[in-house]
């Protein structure tokens, strides 16, 4: 599957780090706002303050974690593109598995295997959905079969009028 709007590999890492950080801050901000609101003392003022405080403290941390994941994933993906010489879904699946394993390395080999499997499965699902969507949308833009005219509506070839029309040859 070709990706048309992707940057070349050195800049792709920076681009993916920034995108992942942004996703983490926004998603984490929404989640932390709800969590801070629910865990604050009773009263709308306390709840809004608790919500804002939770977002201020936790959203940048979550964004940083997402940025680390995105940067490591893109680095491994670019390395695989360079190593294999082609860009295909297997690079992303392998990158997801290796990223999961590397990030879980401090937790031991069992956690590494579990995280590698989860990363690979997650990326396989994402790539599979992307391929299915590409195939589905490609079918929508196929050329339509040529429109064939109804032969009963075409004028006759031998000069006689079509049925229901008078013959004007008698007036010549």
Curated annotation (Swiss-Prot):
Membrane-spanning parts: 17-37, 61-77, 113-133
Membrane topology: Multi-pass membrane protein
Pfam families associated with the record: Tim17
Lipid biosynthesis found in the keyword field: no
Localization in the cell: Mitochondrion inner membrane
Keyword tRNA processing tagged: no
Keywords: Disulfide bond, Membrane, Mitochondrion, Mitochondrion inner membrane, Protein transport, Translocation, Transmembrane, Transmembrane helix, Transport
Principal place of residence: mitochondrion
PTM comment text: Forms one disulfide bond.
Disulfide bonds: 9-78
Protein family (similarity comment): Belongs to the Tim17/Tim22/Tim23 family.
Role, per record: Essential component of the TIM23 complex, a complex that mediates the translocation of transit peptide-containing proteins across the mitochondrial inner membrane.
Protein known as: Mitochondrial import inner membrane translocase subunit Tim17-B
Species name: Homo sapiens (Human)
Gene: TIMM17B
